[in-house]
C-alpha cells in the first residue's frame, strides 16, 4: 500500500544523493528505513538494559513508547506529557554509535542534513510532522478510514505466501546492502545463515565478540579471518584458541559468495546486466535444495522478476533525465577527479543499487511491530531467529572465578548419582565391599570412637617390621604346596601386598570394623597389644609373633577386613 508522504521522502533522498559529497563522507553510505530504525533502537535499548540490569532484552511496550518519544525529540516536535524510559540519553548515544559504525544514516538524519542546503530545496522539503507520520505509520489509519475494508480471503495460505514473499524481499535487499556497504551489521545479521551454512547463533556471537575486540564490522572481521587462513600461511594463522575456527567452513562459503557478487559488480560495465547477474546468483543460492512447487521457490522467482524490472526502470529514468537536460552534454571529468575515491570499475552499477536501496528505505513501515521485532521461526519458515535473539549472547561472560550456584548444585548431585551407581555394580563377593553410607557418616560425624582408629594407626606405624613378619607368616600358611619351609599352622590367607595399602584405606577399614562391631570388636582393638621390637632384631620378633599367631587367633582375627573369613572358608571347600 502506498503511503501519502512516500513521494516527498523519495525526493528528500534524491536530493541527499545529489549532494552526498557535502553531506557525508562516503558514497556507499546506506539509509535506514522505518523498520531498520526501529530494530536499531530495540538493540540499543537491549544493550542499555544489559549494562544496567544484566539482561540483553527489552519488552515491546517499552520499545514502542521510546520510539514515539524518539521521533518527537529528534524532529524537535513538542514532547509535553510524553513518557520516557530511564537512561534515554544513553540509549540515544548507543543508537547513534551503532549507525555510525555501520556507515548508515536514518531518515531523520537525512532530513536534517538536507535542511542545511540552499533555499531552493526548502520549497519542496517535507515537514517534520509529515516525516513523523510516515515513520510512525499513522498514514495507514488515514488510508484505512478513507477506503472501506476489503473482504478477507478465505484461503489462509495466501497470507503465508505474502509473509514468505516479504521475507525473500528482505533477504535480497540485505545481500545488496552488504554488497554496497560492507559495514552494515544489521544486513549481515539477516543473511549470515541464509541459506543454511551452519552459522547459527553461536557463530554469530563469536563473530560479534571478535569484531568488537578488533573494532571492525562483522563482515570485515570474517573477511580478515578467512583471508588470513588463505593467504597468511602458518606464521600468520590465527590462534588455535580462536572460537572462529569452529566455523571456518560456513564463514568461507559466505565470504566466497560475497566475493563472487563483488566480482560480477566489477567485471560487467553494463549496470543492467550486472544487476541481473547479481540477482540471478543470489537466486541460485537461495533455491538450492527447494522444489519448484514450494512457496519459497515461487517467492524467489517473483522477487527476482520484480527487482529486474525496477532496475531497468531506474536506468531508463536516469537516461531520460540526462537527455532532457536542455540537450547539453555532461561536463567531462577533471583530471583530479578521475581517481577521487569513487573512480572504480562498476561504479554505475553501484549507483543503480543505491537507488534501489533508497527506494526500499522509503517504503512504508511494517504495521505489525511485534512480528517485526520478535518474529517466530515456526510461523514464517526460513526466517531464522529475530535480530534481538542473534545479538543476545547465548553464553555468559567468563570473567568470574566462582561458578553459578545452579551449576555447583548440579555438579554435586551428579557426583552423588555416580557414587550411588557405582555401589550397585558389585561382584559375587559383595561382602568384601565397604558400605558408602557408613563411610559418609563416619566422615562427617566424628565422635569419641575415632580415638581407637588413630591408636591403631600409630601402632601399625611403630611395629612395621613386626607386621611385615606376620604378613610373611600368613602368606606361607595360605598355600601348602608352593615352597619349602612355609608355616602350616595358620591357614588364614593374606596377600603379600597387604602392607602397601595406603594409610587412608587402612583408616577406612578400621573405622568400618569399629562401626559394625561396636559391642565387642571396638574393645578388642583397644586391648590389642603389639610387642615392641628392636630395630636390629627383625628375625626374632618375626618368630615370636608367628608363634603368637598360632597360639592366639583372636587378636589376629580382629585385624581382618569384614567378610574375609567367609571368603577364606569359600576357598577352603
Curated annotation (Swiss-Prot):
Chief place where the protein resides: cytoplasm
Cellular-component GO terms for this entry: chromatin; cytoplasm; nucleus
Organism listed in the record: Mus musculus (Mouse)
Gene label: Parpbp
Tissues of expression: Expressed in the ovary, Sertoli cells of the testis and in granular cells within the cerebellum.
InterPro entries named among the record's database cross-references: P-loop_NTPase (IPR027417), PARPBP (IPR038932)
Subunit structure as annotated in this protein's UniProt entry: Interacts with RAD51 and PCNA. Interacts with PARP1. Interacts with TASOR.
Domain of life: Eukaryota
Keywords linked to the UniProt accession: Cytoplasm, DNA damage, DNA repair, DNA-binding, Nucleus
Region feature (Disordered): 470-505, 531-560
Protein name: PCNA-interacting partner
Function recorded in the entry: Required to suppress inappropriate homologous recombination, thereby playing a central role DNA repair and in the maintenance of genomic stability. Antagonizes homologous recombination by interfering with the formation of the RAD51-DNA homologous recombination structure. Binds single-strand DNA and poly(A) homopolymers. Positively regulate the poly(ADP-ribosyl)ation activity of PARP1; however such function may be indirect.
A GO BP entry: DNA repair
Sequence similarity: Belongs to the PARI family.
GO molecular function, one term: DNA binding
Subcellular compartments: Cytoplasm; Nucleus
Amino acid at each position: 500500500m502506498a503511503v501519502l508522504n512516500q513521494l516527498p521522502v523519495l525526493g528528500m533522498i534524491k536530493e541527499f544523493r545529489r549532494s552526498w559529497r557535502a553531506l557525508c563522507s562516503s558514497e556507499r553510505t546506506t539509509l535506514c528505513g522505518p523498520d531498520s530504525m526501529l530494530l536499531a533502537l530495540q538493540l540499543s535499548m537491549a544493550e542499555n538494559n544489559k549494562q544496567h540490569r544484566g539482561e540483553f532484552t527489552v519488552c515491546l511496550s517499552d520499545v514502542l513508547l521510546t520510539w514515539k518519544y524518539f521521533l518527537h525529540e529528534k524532529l524537535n516536535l513538542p514532547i509535553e506529557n510524553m513518557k520516557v524510559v530511564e537512561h534515554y540519553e544513553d540509549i540515544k548515544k548507543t543508537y547513534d554509535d551503532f549507525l555510525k559504525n555501520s556507515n548508515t544514516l536514518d531518515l531523520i538524519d537525512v532530513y536534517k542534513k538536507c535542511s542545511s542546503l540552499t533555499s531552493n530545496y526548502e520549497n519542496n522539503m517535507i515537514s517534520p510532522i509529515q516525516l513523523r507520520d510516515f515513520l510512525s505509520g499513522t498514514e495507514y489509519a488515514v488510508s484505512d478510514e478513507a477506503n472501506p475494508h476489503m473482504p478477507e480471503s478465505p484461503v489462509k495460505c495466501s497470507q503465508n505466501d505474502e509473509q514468505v514473499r516479504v521475507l525473500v524481499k528482505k533477504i535480497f535487499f540485505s545481500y545488496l546492502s552488504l554488497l554496497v556497504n560492507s559495514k552494515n551489521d544489521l544486513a549481515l545479521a539477516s543473511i549470515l545463515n541464509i541459506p543454511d551454512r551452519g552459522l547459527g547463533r553461536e557463530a554469530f556471537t563469536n563473530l560479534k565478540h571478535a569484531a568488537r575486540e578488533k573494532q571492525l564490522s562483522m563482515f570485515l572481521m570474517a573477511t580478515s579471518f578467512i583471508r588470513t587462513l588463505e593467504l597468511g600461511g602458518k606464521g600468520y594463522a590465527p590462534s588455535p584458541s580462536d572460537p572462529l575456527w569452529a566455523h571456518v567452513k560456513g564463514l568461507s562459503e559466505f565470504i566466497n559468495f560475497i566475493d563472487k557478487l563483488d566480482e560480477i559488480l566489477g567485471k560487467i560495465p553494463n549496470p543492467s546486466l550486472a544487476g541481473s547477474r547479481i540477482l540471478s546468483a543470489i537466486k541460485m543460492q537461495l533455491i538450492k535444495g527447494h522444489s519448484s512447487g514450494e512457496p519459497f521457490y515461487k517467492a524467489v522467482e517473483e522477487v527476482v522478476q520484480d527487482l529486474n524490472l525496477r532496475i531497468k526502470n531506474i536506468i531508463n529514468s536516469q537516461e531520460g533525465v540526462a537527455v532532457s537536460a536542455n540537450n547539453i552534454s555532461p561536463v567531462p571529468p577533471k583530471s583530479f577527479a578521475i581517481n577521487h575515491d569513487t573512480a572504480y570499475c562498476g561504479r554505475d552499477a553501484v549507483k543503480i543499487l543505491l537507488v534501489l536501496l533508497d527506494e526500499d528505505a522509503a517504503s512504508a513501515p511494517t504495521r505489525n511491530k511485534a512480528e517485526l521485532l520478535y518474529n517466530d521461526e515456526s510461523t514464517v519458515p526460513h526466517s531464522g531467529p529475530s535480530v534481538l535473539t542473534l545479538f543476545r549472547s547465548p553464553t555468559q561472560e567468563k570473567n568470574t572465578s566462582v561458578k553459578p550456584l545452579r551449576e555447583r548444585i548440579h555438579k554435586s548431585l551428579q557426583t552423588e548419582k555416580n557414587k550411588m551407581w557405582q555401589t550397585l555394580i558389585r561382584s559375587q563377593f559383595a561382602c568384601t565391599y565397604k558400605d558408602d553410607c557408613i563411610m559418609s557418616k563416619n566422615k562427617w560425624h566424628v565422635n569419641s570412637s575415632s580415638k581407637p582408629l588413630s591408636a591403631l594407626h600409630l601402632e601399625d606405624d611403630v611395629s612395621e617390621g613386626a607386621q611385615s613378619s606376620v604378613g610373611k607368616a600368613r602368606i606361607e600358611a595360605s598355600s601348602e604346596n608352593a615352597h619349602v619351609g612355609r608355616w602350616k599352622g595358620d591357614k588364614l590367607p593374606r596377600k603379600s601386598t597387604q602392607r602397601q595399602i595406603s594409610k587412608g584405606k587402612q583408616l577406612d577399614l578400621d573405622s568400618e570394623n569399629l562401626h559394625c562391631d561396636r559391642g565387642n570388636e571396638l574393645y578388642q582393638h583397644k586391648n590389642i597389644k603389639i610387642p615392641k621390637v628392636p630395630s636390629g632384631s627383625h628375625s626374632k620378633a618375626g618368630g615370636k609373633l608367628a608363634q603368637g599367631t598360632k597360639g592366639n587367633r583372636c587378636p589376629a582375627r580382629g585385624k581382618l577386613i569384614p567378610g574375609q573369613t567367609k571368603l577364606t572358608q569359600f576357598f577352603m571347600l
